[in-house]
């Protein structure tokens, strides 16, 4: 007599077992990544020189240092004033993107 319960075929059972293992691995990896580092490991971490920034590097990339050093922005120079306003607006846009919206 055959049992009344259904048994899945071996390939289906193997696929389900593999899927279950992958899901468990994924969740265990996410949980371990979300945990803070132990105190002993955190003490060994040191920021590299120049790793922290205050926004000046963005201004340097946009050419602000060269303009100010060369004295290109003179009274009545509309092109320079316009470039400076666009640069400042762009920096404001970059730094306000990370703030929470009401």
UniProtKB/Swiss-Prot annotation:
Q: Which UniProt keywords apply?
A: Developmental protein, Differentiation, Growth factor, Secreted, Signal, Sulfation
List where in the cell it is found. Answer: Secreted
Q: Name one GO biological process term.
A: cell population proliferation
Q: Is Protein biosynthesis there in the keyword field?
A: no
Q: What start and end residues bound the annotated signal peptide? A: 1-33
**PTM info:** Sulfation is important for activity and for the binding to a putative membrane receptor.
One of the Pfam families matching this protein, by short name: PSK
| Residues with PTM Sulfotyrosine | 93, 95
- Propeptide part(s) removed at maturation, as residue ranges: 34-92, 98-102
**Listed InterPro entries:** Phytosulfokine
**A Gene Ontology molecular function term of the record:** growth factor activity
Gene Ontology cellular component list:
extracellular region
UniProt main location, coarse: secreted
Q: Which family does it belong to?
A: Belongs to the phytosulfokine family.
What does the protein in this record do? Promotes plant cell differentiation, organogenesis and somatic embryogenesis as well as cell proliferation.
What name appears for this protein in its UniProt entry? Phytosulfokines 5
> From what organism does this protein derive?
Oryza sativa subsp. japonica
């Amino acid at each position: 007599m055959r049992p009344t319960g259904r048994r899945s075929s071996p390939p289906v059972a193997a696929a389900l077992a593999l899927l279950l293992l992958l899901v468990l691995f994924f969740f265990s990896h996410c949980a371990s990544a979300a945990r803070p580092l132990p105190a002993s490991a955190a003490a060994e971490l040191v920021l590299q020189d120049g790793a922290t920034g205050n926004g000046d590097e963005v201004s340097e990339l946009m050419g602000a240092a060269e303009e100010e050093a060369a004295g290109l922005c003179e009274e009545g120079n509309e092109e320079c004033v316009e470039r400076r306003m666009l640069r400042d607006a762009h920096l404001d846009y970059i730094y306000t993107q990370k703030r929470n919206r009401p």
